[in-house]
Amino acid sequence: MATSSSAFDDEFPMEEGMPELLDDEDVPSTLPSLLEQNMDTALKSNEFKLVKRKRRAGNAVDVVMEDISQPDDSTTDSPDADAEQKPTKRSKGSKGESRVVPVPKHRYTPLKDNWVNIFTPIVKNLGLQIRFNLKKRQVELRNPADREDTTDLQKATDFVRAFILGFEVNDAIALIRLDHLFLETFEIADVKHSLKGDHVSRAIGRIAGKDGRTKLVIENTTKTRIVVANTKIHILGAYQNLKLARNAVCSLILGSNPSKVYGNLRNMASRGAERL
């Protein structure tokens, strides 16, 4: 186990000499919505980059390329040959395709309280059909009968699944409006399988921190959202931010001091700001 811990430290180095406690001024009281935090990243990724034209050398000579291939009159003139050469367009899914998201018992009440906020963007913005099957205890989503594209259907499924896992509606809805967000789930045993009993509870306590401060700092610094559900960790965010948050959570599970993890995150966040 020592070798795995040292290998992890090499990948995610910890800084020495950090204070033992977090400063109160560094801990935000409330977090903005995940959509607002990642909107700037989405806009920057869509901006055009100005590419300067390279100067042409004075002794450069234009080279004219000639096509020496002889076209076959029998194939070019026939419309049937052109039809055979064109690839057929494949549909992404069948018409009226559906998705199912199971709902555990402890999420019945939150789902009922937030049902209006859930089905409104799915029905009005995406144009899908949704219902909660009480008998089978699952949320069912379906494409319209005249639509084959399943992109919106998959977005709506990820949105509902994120809410069922424990994320707030205002954070989970970012999966519908932004394309660069991902949802990752892993267990504490996947990081350190030797943890059992009270040691698992201590690892969960290190992730959350006193009054949830450690988790709040990680979320605010990495622009992600974290849900700790029993021994499972769910992280929602962009790919690079999700990687930073996952490394921070894994460091806490392996026993690193929260102040050191926070200091390392703060330095990485400052480096990212300098690059932008």
From Swiss-Prot:
What do the Gene Ontology cellular component annotations say? nucleolus; nucleus; small-subunit processome
Where is this protein found? Nucleus, Nucleolus
Q: Where is the composition biased (Acidic residues)?
A: 8-27
Does the keyword section mention RNA-binding?
Answer: yes
Q: Which residues form the signal peptide?
A: none
Annotated region described as Disordered, given as residue ranges: 1-30, 62-101
Q: Name one GO biological process term.
A: ribosomal small subunit biogenesis
The record, for SUPFAM superfamilies, names: Eukaryotic type KH-domain (KH-domain type I)
The domain of life is Eukaryota
> Which PANTHER family did the record assign?
RIBONUCLEASE Y (PTHR12826), RNA-BINDING PROTEIN PNO1 (PTHR12826:SF13)
What this protein is reported to do is described as:
Part of the small subunit (SSU) processome, first precursor of the small eukaryotic ribosomal subunit. During the assembly of the SSU processome in the nucleolus, many ribosome biogenesis factors, an RNA chaperone and ribosomal proteins associate with the nascent pre-rRNA and work in concert to generate RNA folding, modifications, rearrangements and cleavage as well as targeted degradation of pre-ribosomal RNA by the RNA exosome. Positively regulates dimethylation of two adjacent adenosines in the loop of a conserved hairpin near the 3'-end of 18S rRNA.
Q: What is this protein called?
A: RNA-binding protein pno-1
